[in-house]
Amino acid sequence: MRPAAIAALVLAVAVAVGWREARSPTASAAPVAHVRPTAGRPAIVQRPIPFGAKRRAEMRAYARRHYGIDDFHLRTPKVIVEHYTVTDTFQAAYATFANDVPDVELHELPGTCAHFIVDKDGTIYQLVSLTIMCRHTVGLNWTAFGIEQVGRTAREILNRPAQYAAVVRLTSWLRCRYGIALRNVIGHNESLSSPYHRENVASLRRQTHGDWTHTEMTPVRARLGRYRCAG
């Protein structure tokens, strides 16, 4: 067989083999990169609680007593604290925070509050400006956003897909917007282990609550880790 004919035959065989491999269901394909979702701003309903001059003055006095900070502004947010309301409705939790009365536990002013409440159906309500301190976690109010979730246990919230997803979206957006490390997204029960915990009142230095333990927060932080910050 002439060299030209041999070359043509080899080329034909190579093309045929390549065509069969391309059609083969077992042919290797380039791996598809998994793209993590971006932590964009979720839909937020504005339902501000009264936070006028009187309450701001009370918050300023509270910050002086507990943190040595003569200010009511939240200037350096480094922590996000997750809570649950121990109520069955948004309205009940909202009423508690809107009433600027001494809390039943520590009997201090201003009244307790949180920056957000996430309802059972996943609706996100903002109650307080992100530039103002709220009383939600002893030792961390000076540097923490508070997110309350309507419910009585962490298990309830983890088992409500819409509410759980909304909590993750809101927390991811806040975390990315303010450059808050994932390790600093904590449950209220984890407050004493935060490197940002500070408390000038000696009797309150070990004070915390039972909501959102380390075990309960573990799947939440894992899910938050799936989101990437834009930019």
Feature-to-residue mapping (PLM):
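Solvent-exposed, acidic/flexible segments
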Residues: 75, 109, 140, 156-164
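Short, small-residue-rich loop/turn micro-motifs
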Residues: 86, 149-151, 189
